[in-house]
Amino acid sequence: EGEVIAMALDLMHAEAVTDGEPVGMVTTGGTGSIIHALLAYREHAAKHRGITRPNFIKPETGHPAFDKGCHLFGIELRKAPIDPKTAQADVDWVADNIDENTIAIMGSACNYGYGTVDPIPELGQVASERG
């Protein structure tokens, strides 16, 4: 496990981290990985941004493990509607629903259930603009 984590940290340029020591973990599947990611987002936002009432935004088509993780960790879940023709996340809705307590947004490539790809570049732009 340690060797795999070391390789992953190398691939992700962990040496560039300046505000702590990079770490990693191996999980047993997608649901566990998603749940651990949400916990990491929550804890990071609490420590670095002082967020005590976190929220997370995902498209309606996002994996249900995000719903479970938000429930387990007391994170408000905001579900973005999808375009009925493309089954992609509504980027304008996401932008309108981000606030100072948003710890992360997500998009899928490809999404759970439909197999379509959310507009990742546009979601990334919204995330960059909103911090």
Where are these predicted regions, by residue range?
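Conserved PLP-enzyme active-site core in the AAT-like
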Residues: 25, 29-131
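Conserved N-terminal alpha-helix of the aminotransferase class I/II PLP-enzyme fold
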Residues: 1-30, 40, 44
